[in-house]
């Protein structure tokens, strides 16, 4: 959990200003359609105002700018004066308040929209801003979530206020392609735009932040039933692309429509040939969705009190908790391979890792003095006042406790993997409990290691900083897995290779075995491995 008090003033106002060369490029594309009215919903100190001047200001253009902070609004106004912008209006205040009034009247006002909307998490917005953000979704009849970010309603309302055939060019977070809270935005863009192009850099454009950013170029449909060309993603390195006419880049980028526009956009980074190969593989009758062959459930929940409920052997011994201590794992350091057995459990204990989950299922009055002392220690630390703890009785008895033969870590760095839970250890809320419904545990664990599952995980998952991929149960259920009965898997060898950091070798090896059995060539297997690697690299850039 991140708290507002811990955030910098820059993060709280979302103030990451666009480099001038990028603003010039985006503005050139919007201006090339000769707009008469332009919206800048969050102008900051006027970088995009300067970009209009740098591209040759047309005195007939009416410029409507909004800025929440008075010091920045003053700077933007000064830029207008220096560049002799006679038709520019700088409004100090919340853009969303004004936008919602216009949306209420169903007005389409602008020929173009520019900018870099604020990057502020919903939880850090003031209450009135939160209300205005939610109102944008309601006006557009879109699903709202409190996991959203300020840039999403800014982009939505700007697009809604754009006239048919209008252009919008903005610098926004790279998470637009994949985060669940932007799904309503992706769907809306796909519905109202004739074409969408994302320029995705390999570098971080904003200093002092790990926030990846992209350029969004989108053209609104001339009429509602116009066919959409979909979304296309262009990967760029450095700033050489700025030498190219943005219209050429936009026109030459192939869009992929249909499911790509409606779902996550990561798929748009793939070529037509790559998409066709993936579709051909998943069309095979032995390639099935995970939800059709297994069940996945979240691990037991401790309400963030992991340091209390998950303990090392020393704590168990000190408070005589042996009767209530059960084996557990929940992080990659607990299980670096695909097998969690007694040997791995002992290794973890010897390292001093918290390998014991405390399930105290007796009433307090019947417990020994030492166990009571441990519970009192938890109350001194006020664990019993935490929401999930205080609503259960007794507070120290964790609900939903059971183990399965298969586990899966919530987050991974290289590729997702299932874990054969041979000691039936419990898992934390950082891991999932998995049960096979159609095949053996060993076959499911080993079959999960293949390039098509890696690819669909990269397409479905959520990217985080530091090169981390996260999958939630609803996304895991969508993964494709190749299930063939009768294959001989050397699970012990695979486990050792993965522990040795050779997971790509395992993916290639397992893909060769399973895909070969299904009639696919070694060349096709290698191509799928390459696709998985390229998606991992793309995801890593987005993650950092």
Swiss-Prot record:
Q: Which InterPro entries match?
A: DNA_methylase_A-5, DNA_methylase_N6_adenine_CS, M_Eco57I_C, N4_N6_ade-DNA_methylase, SAM-dependent_MTases_sf
How is this chain's activity regulated?
Answer: Stimulated by Ca(2+) and Mg(2+).
Q: Which domain of life is it from?
A: Bacteria
CDD domains, sorted: AdoMet_MTases
Judged by the first EC level, this protein's enzyme class is transferase
Q: Which reaction does it catalyse?
A: a 2'-deoxyadenosine in DNA + S-adenosyl-L-methionine = an N(6)-methyl-2'-deoxyadenosine in DNA + S-adenosyl-L-homocysteine + H(+)
What Pfam family does this protein match (any one)?
A: N6_Mtase
> Which PROSITE patterns does this chain map to?
N6_MTASE
GO terms assigned for molecular function: DNA binding; N-methyltransferase activity; site-specific DNA-methyltransferase (adenine-specific) activity
Which GO biological process categories is it annotated with? DNA restriction-modification system; methylation
**EC numbers for this chain:** 2.1.1.72
Functionally, this protein is described as follows: A gamma subtype methylase that recognizes the (non-palindromic) double-stranded sequence 5'-CTGAAG-3', methylates A-5 on both strands, and protects the DNA from cleavage by the RM.Eco57I endonuclease.
The entry sums up its family as follows: Belongs to the N(4)/N(6)-methyltransferase family.
**Protein's UniProt name:** Type II methyltransferase M.Eco57I
Gene of this entry: eco57IBM
